[in-house]
């Protein structure tokens, strides 16, 4: 899980979602998981 000020999809499998008010990226590649904050 990377924590970044700005989250962007890194590949075609990345999805930007909102969970509990946080913007997150979920992906089939675990290296691409990101969270804002």
UniProtKB/Swiss-Prot annotation:
PROSITE patterns assigned to the protein according to its UniProt record, in alphabetical order: RIBOSOMAL_L36 (PS00828)
A Gene Ontology cellular-component term: cytoplasm
SUPFAM superfamilies reported in the protein's UniProt record: Ribosomal protein L36 (SSF57840)
Keyword Secreted in annotation: no
Source organism superkingdom: Bacteria
Keyword Ion transport recorded: no
GO biological process: translation
GO molecular function, one term: structural constituent of ribosome
Keyword terms, alphabetized: Ribonucleoprotein, Ribosomal protein
Alphabetized InterPro entries for the sequence: Ribosomal_bL36, Ribosomal_bL36_sp
A Pfam cross-reference name: Ribosomal_L36
UniProt record similarity statement: Belongs to the bacterial ribosomal protein bL36 family.
PANTHER family: 50S RIBOSOMAL PROTEIN L36, CHLOROPLASTIC, LARGE RIBOSOMAL SUBUNIT PROTEIN BL36C
Protein name (database record): Large ribosomal subunit protein bL36
Native organism: Ligilactobacillus salivarius (strain UCC118) (Lactobacillus salivarius)
């Amino acid at each position: 899980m990377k924590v970044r000020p700005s989250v962007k999809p890194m590949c075609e499998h990345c999805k930007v979602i909102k969970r509990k008010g946080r913007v997150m990226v979920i992906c089939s590649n675990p290296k691409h998981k990101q969270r804002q904050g």
